[in-house]
């Protein structure tokens, strides 16, 4: 019967997404994911020794040790760590353990930009191992000692990874995508570690139902509190004037700034106005081909501010960054996204503070939740 077919790759059983060719069923939900698969016979080529030029904080060391013990016992883990806590470092010890046993290690994340940014960090931590990145237009080589990849590429690795780390499980497009979630599950033959600054109740329930454990880290590695957002309730004209004044102030103080917008259209309009009054800025979004070039110019202080969509809510770390969120009451800004955006500020040990300003016509439930959660994290870390 038609409705009994279950796709072996993405587990789809919905008749609406099942087609038939010559009487044989096929899945339309994941048919677009086509390409060669990784060779499971690959063996580690280099020396899997972890090398860190900096010490972990006491809290990081404790979590890292707990993760390792869980991985040794075959147990899965969800790490709930605040933005800037140093989540990536928490899995290095476990990666080293699996690699020394000759196992396959993967580090997946929803966004290509984050994969690219991870390459030098992982290569520095494991300098004697080969590290590759696999994403949309970069998939000619699939095997290496450590594989960094977008979650879209996990279908190439069925029952492959002895340890699979999935970063940013709360991020688009992984969040709520059953096909990508199935690819993740299918690629595991050992243990997995999930990383998130804003896991949902569903995420926590699923890991516990899977007999896994939830580990929490509410303290940043530099022991300073998370910058807590301030809400300014203003209508559009007043909002734009406020942003211009703040950008001019930050430029005088030599403070780089992200100005977040909910949509590309609003971002283009806002930047066209800001650019008349404040120089040395640019607009970036998922549609901008020059995005990575503009980000590098921003890091080099050629640009003093970037107007950006949520594309920069993760992955980019800049010293002394200030954060402004315009139209913070827009329905596209949920509490999870606002927490991530606020987490861009104060990440560097030599600049652990920064302003986070939400501007909107009113205080929404999502704004209140974000402000409340960030305050709660600081309380739990004992920093208030």
Regions of interest found by a model, annotated:
Residues 129-143, 283-309:
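Conserved helicase ATPase core of P-loop NTP-dependent helicases/translocases
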Residues 1-45:
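Interdomain "pre-motor" coupling segment immediately N-terminal to P-loop NTPase/helicase cores
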């Amino acid at each position: 019967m038609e409705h009994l077919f279950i796709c072996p790759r993405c587990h789809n059983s919905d008749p609406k997404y099942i087609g038939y060719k010559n009487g044989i069923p096929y899945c339309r939900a994941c048919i677009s994911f086509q390409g060669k698969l990784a060779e499971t016979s690959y063996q580690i080529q280099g020396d899997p020794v972890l090398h860190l030029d900096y010490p972990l904080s006491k809290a990081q060391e404790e979590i890292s040790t707990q993760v390792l013990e869980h991985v040794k016992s075959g147990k899965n883990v969800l790490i709930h760590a605040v933005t800037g806590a140093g989540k990536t470092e928490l899995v290095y010890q476990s990666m080293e353990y699996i690699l020394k046993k000759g196992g396959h290690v993967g580090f997946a994340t929803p966004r290509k930009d984050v994969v690219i940014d991870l390459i030098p960090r992982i290569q520095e931590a494991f300098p004697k191992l080969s590290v590759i990145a696999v994403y949309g237009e970069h998939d000619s080589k699939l095997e290496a000692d450590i594989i960094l990849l977008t979650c879209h590429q996990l279908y190439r690795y069925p029952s492959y990874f002895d340890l699979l780390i999935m970063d940013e499980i709360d991020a688009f497009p992984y969040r709520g995508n059953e096909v990508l979630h199935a690819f993740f599950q299918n690629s595991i033959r050992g243990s997995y570690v999930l990383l998130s600054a804003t896991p949902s109740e569903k995420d926590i329930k699923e890991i516990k139902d899977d007999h896994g454990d939830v580990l929490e880290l509410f303290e940043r590695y530099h022991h300073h509190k998370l910058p807590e957002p301030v809400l300014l309730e203003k209508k559009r004209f007043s909002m734009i004037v406020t942003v211009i004044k703040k950008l001019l102030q930050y430029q005088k103080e030599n403070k780089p700034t992200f100005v977040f917008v909910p949509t590309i259209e609003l971002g283009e309009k806002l930047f066209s106005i800001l650019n008349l009054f404040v120089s040395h800025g640019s607009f970036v979004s998922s549609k901008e081909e020059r995005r990575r070039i503009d980000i590098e110019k921003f890091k080099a202080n050629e640009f003093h501010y970037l107007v950006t969509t949520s594309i920069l809510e993760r992955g980019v770390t800049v010293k002394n960054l200030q954060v402004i969120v315009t139209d913070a009451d827009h329905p596209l800004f949920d509490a999870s996204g606002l927490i991530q955006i606020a987490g861009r500020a104060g990440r560097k040990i030599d600049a652990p503070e920064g302003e986070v300003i939400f501007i909107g016509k009113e205080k929404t439930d999502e704004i209140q939740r974000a402000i409340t959660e960030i305050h709660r994290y600081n309380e739990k870390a004992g920093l208030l």
